[in-house]
Amino acid sequence: MFKVTTENYSIVKETIERAPTFVYSILEQVIEGAVYADNESLHSLLFQTKSGIYYVYGDSSSEQVISKLAALLQESIEQNKRFTLFSYSEDWNTKIEQRLNVYVNKLERYTFSFDKNAYNNREKHESLNYECIKIKQHQIDHCLEFNNQYYEEYWGSTSNFLENGFGFCLKHGDKIISEAVSIFKSQQFAEIDIVTDSNYRGLGLASFIAEKFIDDCLLNDIKPCWDCDIDNHGSYHVGAKLGFTNPVKYAVFYKSTDR
């Protein structure tokens, strides 16, 4: 097992077919992270963000990768750090459940494909009487949920998000009532994270602010990404209305003590 040098990240990027957005963020060095491989052929790969989010890819028979995961999991338990492992492969799911089952719980999620034509032909919403503005430091300081700690967790720092990410918020007077931000972003992809004040739900705010996010993506030739838990029917429904189709199930394993 060895750590892939940043000089070889472009080779790794060509190797992977489909992966979570944070993988591309690591490979493009938008966020801090590491890439491990079982050997120089890159048959099995492990991606790690600084905050403890992982993605496993390739040949699931690699003993080196599963051993590395076990060591990282043990370290997270001892040091009370985050351990969240993404897997798009049933073979890897089986391997992880066999080897790490005592220490992790499994959550199933959907990732979607974005259909630009479906989005352009969607049922348009009436304009809402709320101010929509791009998120900057002032909005973060007065946020609904996505505060400095959030950006430190996923972006390494608020300044990195402000430089390389983007987001929007809706305001009712001086109060922020909905936010949509890129939890992860690369040159090609931007994964959306949305929150709406519970007092303003059912008004179509999530769809409205998501449209602002998607429009900004399309303006900059970026593909928007939408994921949700399989039992989050509200998010599934909103995504479907916005052109996110072809749901594909994947697994997220998290440390048993985390939830």
Q: Model-predicted segments: where are they?
A:
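Active-site rim helix/loop that mediates acceptor-substrate recognition in acyltransferases
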Residues: 20-31, 145-171
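Conserved acetyl-CoA-binding loop-helix of GNAT-fold acetyltransferases
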Residues: 63-72, 202-215, 237, 241
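Conserved active-site alpha-helix within GNAT-family acetyltransferase domains
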Residues: 91-104, 207, 230-248
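Short amphipathic alpha-helix that is part of the acyltransferase structural core
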Residues: 1-20, 118-156
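A conserved beta-strand-loop-helix scaffold within acyl/acetyltransferase catalytic domains
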Residues: 156-189, 193-197
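Acyl-donor-binding surface of acyltransferase catalytic domains
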Residues: 39-44, 48-137
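Conserved catalytic-core motifs of GNAT/GCN5-like acyltransferases
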Residues: 104-117, 243-259
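Conserved beta-hairpin
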Residues: 32-49, 166-180
